[in-house]
Design a protein with these regions (language model features):
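Short, low-complexity N-terminal intrinsically disordered segments enriched in polar/charged residues
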Residues: 1-30
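A structural signal for alpha-helical segments
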Residues: 3, 45-48, 106
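Alpha-helical scaffold segments in carbohydrate-active enzymes
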Residues: 14-17, 59, 117
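A solvent-exposed, acidic/Ser-Thr-rich amphipathic alpha-helical stretch
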Residues: 24-95
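A beta-strand edge to alpha-helix "cap/lid" segment located at domain peripheries
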Residues: 63-150
């Protein structure tokens, strides 16, 4: 992997780490300069910016007594295409979110894909766009306050 590949993959993993820690404000800061597509199939697509994403997460993600959503986001199969000259990149990856609440079972609650775009600004890679795709949806009742049409 090139340096760009590693730095971009680290952005994917940092998102998962911050979300699982319940550090929503730090997590949303990863998208400070990005457009986030929540529903690409809607007409027009549902798109939010950093502040809209924070408002959504704050109202939607259940934070449990330990200060976390009690989740583990596993991000895998990142397929990256980096254009070093243009200082842009795309990445298609998959995610599966596991959750365990109280004495309940550890279970997958949702799985899907992230379709990301990145740009290099002042020598650092950052998200410029993220599209969420939910492919498989389980019991989200302990993770989200509503299903948002999932």
């Amino acid at each position: 992997m090139t340096t760009a590949d590693t730095l971009i993959a680290n952005l994917l993993y940092r998102y998962a780490e911050l979300m699982d820690a319940g550090r929503l404000e730090e997590c949303v800061d990863l998208f400070a300069h990005a457009r986030v597509v929540l529903d690409a199939d809607a007409e027009p697509p549902v798109v939010v910016d950093r502040d809209g994403l924070l408002a959504l997460w704050t109202s939607l993600v259940r934070i449990h007594a330990d200060g976390t959503p009690r989740t583990r986001h596993l991000v895998g199969t990142p397929i990256q295409e980096v254009d070093e000259e243009a200082e842009t990149a795309t990445c298609r990856s998959t995610y599966t979110v596991f959750q365990q609440v109280d004495d309940g079972p550890l279970q997958p609650v949702i799985s899907g894909r992230y379709l990301d775009r990145f740009e290099m600004v002042d020598g650092s890679w950052r998200f410029s766009e993220r599209t969420y795709r939910a492919d498989l949806v389980g019991d989200l009742s302990n993770h989200l306050t509503s299903r948002l049409g999932l």
